[in-house]
C-alpha cells in the first residue's frame, strides 16, 4: 500500500459519512433513522479514530492504522461531547486505489 496515496482525514470522514447515508435506510431501524435525521444538526457527528482492536473479530485482514481508519457516526448528549449513541462504526481503507469498507450497524 502507498502511504502517499491516502485519503486525508477530511476525505475519510466525508467518504464514510456518504456511505453511511447511502446504506442507513437498509440497515437501521426506521425509528433510529428518524431520530438521527431530527437530531443530527444539534447533536450529531462523525469522529475519526485508529481502528479499534475488536475489528479483528469482524474482518479477516490486518487493520493497520496506516491504511485503515474507523469513523464513528452517531449522536452525543450535547454539542461538543463524545458520541455516545453510535449508529454505525465504519472501517474504511484510506488508500485511494482500494475501495474497501466494512460497517457495524446499531442493533
Swiss-Prot record:
Q: What organism is recorded for this protein?
A: Yersinia enterocolitica serotype O:8 / biotype 1B (strain NCTC 13174 / 8081)
InterPro entries reported in the protein's UniProt record: dsDNA_mimic_put, Put_dsDNA_mimic_sf
Q: Which Pfam families match?
A: DUF440
Q: Which domain of life is it from?
A: Bacteria
The free-text function statement in the UniProt record for this protein reads:
May act as a double-stranded DNA (dsDNA) mimic. Probably regulates the activity of a dsDNA-binding protein.
Kindly provide the name given to this protein in its UniProt entry.
Putative double-stranded DNA mimic protein YE2228
| Family in the record | Belongs to the putative dsDNA mimic protein family.
Amino acid at each position: 500500500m502507498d502511504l502517499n496515496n491516502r485519503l486525508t482525514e477530511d476525505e475519510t470522514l466525508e467518504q464514510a459519512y456518504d456511505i453511511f447515508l447511502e446504506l442507513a435506510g437498509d440497515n437501521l431501524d426506521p425509528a433510529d433513522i428518524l431520530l438521527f435525521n431530527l437530531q443530527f444538526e444539534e447533536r450529531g457527528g462523525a469522529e475519526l479514530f485508529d481502528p479499534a482492536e475488536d475489528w479483528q473479530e469482524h474482518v479477516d485482514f490486518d487493520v493497520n492504522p496506516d491504511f485503515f481508519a474507523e469513523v464513528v457516526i452517531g449522536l452525543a448528549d450535547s454539542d461538543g461531547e463524545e458520541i455516545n449513541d453510535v449508529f454505525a462504526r465504519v472501517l474504511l481503507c484510506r488508500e485511494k486505489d482500494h475501495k474497501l469498507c466494512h460497517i457495524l450497524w446499531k442493533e
